[in-house]
Amino acid sequence: MSASYQTIEHDVPQSYRDKILKWNGWGYSDSQFAINKDGHVTFTGDKYEISGKVMPHFRPWFENYLGIDLGFVSPAQKLSDVIIDAPVENEDIIEFLQENKISFSNEARIRLMRGHGHTVHDMINLREGKIPRLPDIVVWPKSEHEIVKIIEGAMSHNCAIIPIGGGTSVTNALDTPETEKRAVISMDMALLDKILWIDRENLTCRAQAGIVGQSLERQLNKKGFTCGHEPDSIEFSTLGGWVSTRASGMKKNKYGNIEDLVVHLNFVCPKGIIQKQCQVPRMSSGPDIHQIILGSEGTLGVVSEVTIKIFPIPEVKRFGSFVFPNFESGVNFFREVAIQRCQPASLRLMDNDQFVMGQALKVASDSWWADLKSSVSKMYITSWKGFKVDEICAATCVYEGNREEVDQHEERLNKLAEQFHGVVGGAENGQYGYRLTFAIAYLRDLGMNHGVLGESFETSVPWDKVLSLCRNVKELMKREAKAQGVTHPVLANCRVTQVYDAGACVYFYFGFNARGLKNGLEVYDRIETAARDEIIACGGSISHHHGVGKIRKQWMLTTNGAVGIALLKAIKSELDPANIFASANLIDIIGSPHCKL
């Protein structure tokens, strides 16, 4: 790495972000899908259940489905060859940080690691060594008091601030605006990572906002509790990040989304600290100020502490699965589950293409009995039940509770599935589906290594529009890809991941072989934009839980209306009149060079 400036720093912490995470890909440095010496796909490292396992069926599926050759490699640029521009100089803020003994650094790699999230643009730019505008200084507050001091310093010395938690954003929320002329401070919350107290009587927990999800859950488990919030990013995302993006976890059916779990929070903004004066389950005291902070995406200030609900660890956790003859049958089953309000902790439905992809990711078995059992199961489904291989879809679920509750819940869902021509697939298949949850995020890196551009995105949609939205968006992505010159088959599948009374959350996975395209990222952008337009046209939302960031701002006016946008701008103007928190997420500030609204 080359940087033509002097590094200045004070009391820099040893951060897991810098030590064990990839700088240009998802997750841990030692974990990735790779090709072994026998030409099969395997998973490296030791952090996941599929680590060290071979997936003999995945390579042929991947190559045939996307028209690629895994022997062709699109290498990423080495970190040592990446050139980082010098930061915007601001000696006053450096002196301020030194005087107040606040940990900081302007070292190139540290700035780089905090200057991006995980969109396909972020990753391709890093792989190609195209480094955009980065934050100029990274600070690590060790207390709420230091957060206040840093904001005061930014206001006094003409700086901007972009907070960062786990860095898992997929909305360009962490990208520094190219138009920002001030020195930009990245406020890394990593040192604010402690549980402050656990209240066993009221079943609440107070924690600092920088605590990583898996650490929070691990510490609670040792005390006999769970927070119940389990997003797919739980290994790396933080409590403060969950609040800032209005996050959702896969077990929301039992425990709720983050807005249901928050009891109290502290929020530091340029005008001071926002906090309610009591920690109660509900208040009727005017509009709920928590709802202003939830989903604010670092545009108004930074979350410092949060009180959340906690729950005793359930006595029983059991997996389940179902196979349906087609996607429509599965969706109708989900709708009936919602009507009868008998959702298990988690319930997911994969369409046929995603079901086939999941089968391709099955690891090689050492047991001939397991292989035989799998063959018999497939014969039962296809030959005896008459399910068509190119229409089958599957659902996986998690039951949690005491043994009696789980037994009754499982029996009820099994009977309900039969009414919609479903076949019980058993706990083992359900458990395998959830085992893949955290490892599957690494698939995109494998694709990029071989010329594939891909992304996932989500929406929420009313029940009466789920089927049409899924069908129309998938068809549009394939049609638009062909129109944009993509000559190979396109990956376009979906799953229903959350069940609500009035609708569902739908996740789309999209990817294509970009070899031979001169402008692969531009093609990708045009396809994704068309897909999001189609989602809106089909009655879906701008996002269910990923948030808006910068990449979805163009739909904010359509989503919230002119008066709604005016209200958001008024809140911004009141809490942050100097635009200190200048991430440019959600809305554009009137008078800024990039203002469109």
UniProtKB/Swiss-Prot annotation:
Give the protein's cofactors. Answer: FAD
Q: InterPro entries, from UniProt?
A: Alkyl-DHAP_Synthase, FAD-bd_oxidored_4_C, FAD-bd_PCMH, FAD-bd_PCMH-like_sf, FAD-bd_PCMH_sub1, FAD-bd_PCMH_sub2, FAD-linked_Oxase-like_C, Oxid_FAD_bind_N
Which catalytic residues are annotated? Y507 (proton donor/acceptor)
Annotated pathway: Glycerolipid metabolism; ether lipid biosynthesis
Which stretches does the entry tag as region Important for enzyme activity?
Answer: 544-546
Q: Which domain of life is it from?
A: Eukaryota
What PANTHER family does the annotation carry? ALKYLDIHYDROXYACETONEPHOSPHATE SYNTHASE, PEROXISOMAL (PTHR46568:SF1)
Q: What does this protein do?
A: Catalyzes the exchange of an acyl for a long-chain alkyl group and the formation of the ether bond in the biosynthesis of ether phospholipids.
Q: Which family does it belong to?
A: Belongs to the FAD-binding oxidoreductase/transferase type 4 family.
Task: Name the chain's protein.
Answer: Alkyldihydroxyacetonephosphate synthase
Q: Which gene encodes it?
A: ads-1
